[in-house]
């Protein structure tokens, strides 16, 4: 299903699954009143943490660990590791990986013990539908666990091990099949999303910078430090003691020796993985290096504690009293107290709880990894109300609202169509489209903070209203007229040249030619032609190319540096020597233009803050641009930016650039580009000559009528997706990807009824897979055991 309040029209399943769409626990939201949703949101954090401890304990008991105190302390240590305190409370869905990993390993153990293995399939299914990203990481950890547990067993022959492995793979695939309705579409979307490629970490893949290892040592037992690359450790000292005992104590039993050697090797392996960026990249779906999998490391540490705590209790209750008596006979009474395992269990429990309390205080303290000051009070989660809901209800038809640099995803909460979004699984072509214009508000590959008040970009995106704050001189695009304030008291401007959802163009340009133009020239093309893939353009034979007829009303010039404060610029290196450093530029200016400042070949080499927002002030208006250090995980290779200085009837002749923090930047030059508005209305009038009439926008369906005097391309301000299909007068029509972003359909002369329908890609195949998977799992629980019992009775 497509939802136009998600981004600019993204798929519900593929976009929201990363945030819990599909999580069975979130079904509770369906019966919870709206007023209680925030409370439910908070409660589910602790429910997930509790279930993580329950499943961990279940796994330990399945492993025949009967010392309940050891299991309880291990579970508590696991539940309150730094990963849960930092990642789990900040992003509750991050707890899903932590919650289901013990179930994965429990399922493996049950298969090894020749018990029912339906639980394993159910765990795989629930994990993948809750969040396939963490399901992927759990799968890798499960595979490592199988290697360490199955293959070292000398009593099992190779043939027997192969049979067990085949059963595991079969049970795993059954779980994958059952999750297909959600997993198939999501995996398909992930493979084409902008976040799945390289980015963020730019150093060697074999070792992190020295600062990472310094932080790693300090953050191993402390929660008041963020190590970096999503590495969250903060273990208890008791867990550290468990590791020491594991490596120093020798077991007499062969079975225990094999188990302990497996744990030692596993500990070393996971520690090495923490320290090698390549491992972080593999675990992060071959994106940037990230150690979000370190909840598995926390589980290993907690399990080592469960294994070694009985050894520690034996040493303390047996060896220590003997040593005390030998040292001083007068301490026999004390030795008698120390000989009680209950005493040591109680004492170690207190020590662990005090340690955890200190970790929690450190984590949420002023210098902690997750400061309380970063969270909002309950009841204020929606931020400042923009009054968009009422605006959307008061107007007919499909349109979008521009609210520059506003809160991402608030359009989803307030139910209006906008341009502000932040989604980890966003289609890759969204980024490709905005990247063509070096759009400064595309702060990350998966986050858009509005369209930078750019007239052309808003026009082709069906933007009807511009909502600004109460500043004296807002950066309103050309052609927008003030119509009053909305219910939130914000200024509202209406687009006088509004292009509806469907409009027509009579020319096209090949993408290869489009890419030869400068960023602002490309904006000019959007208003005159459809930009098509070269193969598609060759097939549109009835339409003349508009390349030779385009009118590009732009000009550019170099800037002159007037003054610098806290900044030096020499040999293409811009050095900001103090916080708040600024540089003033002068240029001739041009009337009736949208003026852009172009940071040409501009990159952060080093900055005091990994993420900062700079500002450019011109003609009393201020705009923003993002500065991201290569150390930041969201960094991507963007050598230039363009920043809109706004539309003005009078020439804009100067601007001041401010850098919040110290840093070193490479920069070839500052350029100013002017986009004239002299012929703007003429261009939009041409596009409005033939528009989609009787347009209806419904759930997964768009329809309307056209009456053309000649062949044209119907351009739709809906993002392209393979999930859309189209018919014209009942016959299937090809949907073209236009502008690298939107959809276009070629229409002949005469009357045409156009209808588009949406189906989530891979959803049909996924539903069929889920049906088959559920049947197989049902057979695992009920069918196979019934057959076995019948055979035993006959025997």
Task: List where the protein language model places each region.
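Membrane-interface coil-to-helix junctions
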Residues: 1-53, 76-99, 137, 190-195, ...
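Active-site-proximal, structured, solvent-exposed surfaces of multi-pass membrane proteins
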Residues: 548, 554-795
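Extracytoplasmic/lumenal acceptor-recognition loop(s) of multi-pass membrane glycoenzymes
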Residues: 8, 18, 354-374, 391-460, ...
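Membrane-embedded helix bundles of polyisoprenyl
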Residues: 50-63, 67-152, 167-187, 192, ...
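Periplasmic/ER-lumenal interhelical loops and adjacent helix-loop junctions
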Residues: 1-6, 17-18, 24, 164-252, ...
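Membrane-interface junctions at the ends of membrane-embedded or membrane-associated helices
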Residues: 63-66, 109-119, 149-163, 251-256, ...
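Membrane-helix boundary/interfacial segments in multi-pass membrane proteins
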Residues: 86-95, 199-215, 219-231, 257-334, ...
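Membrane-interface helix-loop-helix junctions at transmembrane boundaries of multi-pass membrane enzymes
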Residues: 155-166, 244-271, 421, 436
């Amino acid at each position: 299903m497509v939802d136009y309040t998600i981004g600019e029209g993204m798929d519900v399943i593929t976009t929201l699954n990363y945030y819990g769409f599909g999580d069975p626990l979130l079904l509770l939201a369906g019966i919870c009143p709206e007023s209680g949703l925030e409370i439910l949101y908070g409660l589910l954090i602790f429910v997930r943490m509790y279930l993580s401890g329950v499943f961990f304990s279940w796994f330990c008991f399945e492993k025949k660990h009967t010392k309940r105190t050891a299991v309880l302390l291990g579970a508590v240590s696991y539940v309150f590791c730094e990963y849960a305190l930092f990642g789990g409370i900040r992003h509750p869905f991050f707890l899903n990986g932590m919650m289901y990993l013990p179930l994965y390993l429990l399922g493996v153990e049950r298969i090894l013990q020749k018990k029912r293995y339906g639980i394993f399939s159910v765990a795989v299914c629930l994990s993948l539908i809750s969040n396939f990203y963490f399901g992927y990481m759990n799968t890798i950890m499960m595979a490592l666990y199988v290697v360490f547990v199955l293959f070292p067993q000398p009593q099992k022959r190779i043939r027997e091990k192969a049979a067990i492995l085949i059963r595991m793979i079969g049970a795993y695939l059954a779980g994958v099949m059952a999750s297909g309705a959600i997993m198939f579409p999501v995996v398909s979307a992930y493979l084409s999303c902008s976040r799945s490629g390289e980015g963020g970490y730019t150093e060697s893949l074999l070792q992190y910078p020295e600062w990472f290892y310094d932080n790693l040592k300090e953050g191993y037992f402390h929660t008041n430090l963020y190590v970096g690359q999503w590495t969250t450790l903060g273990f208890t000292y008791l867990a550290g003691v468990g590791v020491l005992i594991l490596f120093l104590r020798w077991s007499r039993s062969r079975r225990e020796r094999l188990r302990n050697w497996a744990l030692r090797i596993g500990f070393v392996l996971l520690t090495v993985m923490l320290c090698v960026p390549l491992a972080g990249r593999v675990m992060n779906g071959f994106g940037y290096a990230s150690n979000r999998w370190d909840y598995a490391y926390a589980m290993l540490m907690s399990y080592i504690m469960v294994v070694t705590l009985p050894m520690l209790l034996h040493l303390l209750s047996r060896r220590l009293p003997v040593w005390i008596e030998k040292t001083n006979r007068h301490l026999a009474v004390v030795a008698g107290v120390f000989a009680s395992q209950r005493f040591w269990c109680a004492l170690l429990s207190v020590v662990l709880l005090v340690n955890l309390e200190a970790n929690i205080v450190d984590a949420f303290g002023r210098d902690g990894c997750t400061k309380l000051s970063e969270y909002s009070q309950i009841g204020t989660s929606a931020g400042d109300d923009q009054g968009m809901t009422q605006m959307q209800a008061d107007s007919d038809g499909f349109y979008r609202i521009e609210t520059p640099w506003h809160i991402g995803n608030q359009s989803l909460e307030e139910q209006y169509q906008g341009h502000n979004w932040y989604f980890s699984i966003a289609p890759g072509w969204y980024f490709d489209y905005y990247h063509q214009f070096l759009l400064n508000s595309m702060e990350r590959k998966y986050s858009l903070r509005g369209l930078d008040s750019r007239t052309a970009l808003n026009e082709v995106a069906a933007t009807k209203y511009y909502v600004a704050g109460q500043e004296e001189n807002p950066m309103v695009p050309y052609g927008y007229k003030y119509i009053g304030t909305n219910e939130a008291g914000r200024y509202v401007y209406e687009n006088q040249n509004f292009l509806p959802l469907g409009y027509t163009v009579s020319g096209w340009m090949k993408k290869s030619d489009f890419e030869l133009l400068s960023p602002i020239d490309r904006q000019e093309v959007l208003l005159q032609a459809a930009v098509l893939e070269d193969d598609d353009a060759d097939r549109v034979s009835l339409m003349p190319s508009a390349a030779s007829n385009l009118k590009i009303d732009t000009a550019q010039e170099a800037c002159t540096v007037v003054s610098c404060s806290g900044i030096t610029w020499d040999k293409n290196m811009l050095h900001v020597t103090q916080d708040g450093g600024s540089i003033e530029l002068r240029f001739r200016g041009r009337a009736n233009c949208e003026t852009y400042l172009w940071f040409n070949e501009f990159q952060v080499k080093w900055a005091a803050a990994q993420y900062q927002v700079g500002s450019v002030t011109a003609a009393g208006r201020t705009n923003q641009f993002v500065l991201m250090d290569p150390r930041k995980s969201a960094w991507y290779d963007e050598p230039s930016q363009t920043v809109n200085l706004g539309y003005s009837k009078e020439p804009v002749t100067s601007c001041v650039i401010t850098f919040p923090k110290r840093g070193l930047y490479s920069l070839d030059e500052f350029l100013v580009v002017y986009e004239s508005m002299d012929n703007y209305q003429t261009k939009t009038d041409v596009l409005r000559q033939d528009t989609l009439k009787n347009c209806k926008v419904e759930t997964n369906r768009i329809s309307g009528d056209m009456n053309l005097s000649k062949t044209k391309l119907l351009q739709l301000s809906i993002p392209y997706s393979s999930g859309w299909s189209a018919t014209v007068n009942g016959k299937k029509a090809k949907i073209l990807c236009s502008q690298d972003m939107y959809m276009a359909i070629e229409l002949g002369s005469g009357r045409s009824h156009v209808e588009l329908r949406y189906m989530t890609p891979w959803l049909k195949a996924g539903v069929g897979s889920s049906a088959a998977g559920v049947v197989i799992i049902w057979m695992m629980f009920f069918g196979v055991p019934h057959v076995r019992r019948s055979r035993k009775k006959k025997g």
